[in-house]
Amino acid sequence: EFENEYLGYLSTGQQQRVMIARALISNPELLILDEPASGLDYLARETLLEVLETLSHERPEITIIYVAHFIEEIIPIFDKIFILSKGMNFAQGKIDDVLTNKTMSSLFNRNVEVVNYKNRFSLHMIG
């Protein structure tokens, strides 16, 4: 889609998609994405996540490690989660087992409600 464009002229979201495509050329077994949605607006972030979902279905042999700071970026293709707090392992396991009100409230030291709507998560502070 962007083959005749200079990378510097593309939007941040387009650049992220190009970088993922470049990484896939070598047919990797592992794709590590460190905050790939950082700096993206809502639409670009959702487009990136859709690209990853498509990739997961088309290339199920690829393991994706996705590093994020926001729970909203967790999509159904991810089956496990590892939460760090202050550089230490805070919680890990299956997403439904870890993303609970109790665990997230403990993480933030506040009452938190985890909302799962159509397999997408969000957090709401209570009180």
Language model features by range: what are they?
Residues 31-34:
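Catalytic Walker B motif of ABC-type/P-loop ATPase nucleotide-binding domains
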Residues 68-69:
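H-loop/switch region of ABC-family ATPase nucleotide-binding domains
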Residues 27:
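Conserved catalytic motifs of ABC-family nucleotide-binding domains
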Residues 46-59:
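Helical segment within the ABC ATPase nucleotide-binding domain
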Residues 107-127:
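ABC ATPase nucleotide-binding domains
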Residues 6-10:
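Conserved ABC ATPase signature
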